[in-house]
Amino acid sequence: MPSFISIQNIIYPSNELSLTMILLEEWSLTYVEGIDSKKYLQGQLTIDINLLLKTHHTLCAHCNFNGRVWSTMHLFHYEKGYAYIQRKSVSQIQIKEICKYSIFSKIKIRELNSICLIGFAGCNVRSFLSSLFVKIPNQSCPVIHEDNKTILWYEKPSERFLLVLPFLDFLTLKRKINQNIFLNNSKQWLLLDIEAGLPVIDKICSNKFTPQAINLHNLKAISFKKGCYYGQETIARIFFKKTNKYFLCFLVSTGSIFPKIGSFIETKVDSEWFKVGVLLSIVHVKCEEIYIQVVLRKSVNINNLFRIHGFENIFLIKN
């Protein structure tokens, strides 16, 4: 039986991406069930869960008492409760923290290790998925449930989809593919998230930033009208007093470097370099370019030259 799937080891920006299936091994799925799940999540997350339709998913954050982000996640209705997708490196500590106050609630929170997260993106991706599924999500209905499979629709940086399905169903899906498609790892999805302006919070950067510092207020991931939730006092104060001093952006350079996540970002003023930000994520693109997502001080000149502490490669802010 011929294989239509070709391994791809090069990461491409969205405007150059061929039809690609992406294994999201760096992300995880957490499931929340129980009669108190809605009420409990309402007191923990930054969005108003009462407004979340069953046909939609939403970006949000889980913060500590001081308004620092443990993790960012995409939340949606799933089976008998809710599920959210977050970075795998932070899932264990995030689940531990969100369970701390659940002893008196009828709720169960756990990571679903038996579920596969598979991305689809690139040229003609909608047409491709339409040959495999009866319904495909879109802007008006970004979440579709079909049997025991769920498909999420993402608009930016270009139309893409995330499939949530059991491993055996993934194997069945692979056997049904009858047209050429590339297979890549989660770095490809990471790049698409960076291009889309979605903050990437791994374990090393957990518990360091407020939601506003990573642009969640502009991504409609914070509700300022709901009742109390963890971190609300700090988050609301920053919003109403306009005291946020940071912003999320992505920078580009060339070369091949491997800095640690959490490294300092420096900018050049006159002849000296000063620390002005923190590295959240990095992807090597087409073997020659480097894309990084960073948190910078708002006071910085966006036309400046930047570098990662300990490396000489010069970065510029991507417009």
From Swiss-Prot:
Q: Where in the cell is it found?
A: Cytoplasm
Q: Which UniProt keywords apply?
A: Cytoplasm, Folate-binding, tRNA processing
Q: Which GO terms describe its molecular function?
A: folic acid binding
Q: Does the keyword Zinc-finger apply?
A: no
InterPro entries, alphabetized: GcvT/YgfZ_C (IPR029043), tRNA-modifying_YgfZ (IPR023758), YgfZ/GcvT (IPR045179), YgfZ/GcvT_CS (IPR017703), YgfZ_barrel (IPR048451)
Q: Which residues make up the binding site for folate? A: 27, 189
What the protein does? Folate-binding protein involved in regulating the level of ATP-DnaA and in the modification of some tRNAs. It is probably a key factor in regulatory networks that act via tRNA modification, such as initiation of chromosomal replication.
UniProt similarity note: Belongs to the tRNA-modifying YgfZ family.
Q: This chain belongs to which protein, by name?
A: tRNA-modifying protein YgfZ
User: Whose protein is this, by species?
Assistant: Buchnera aphidicola subsp. Acyrthosiphon pisum (strain APS)
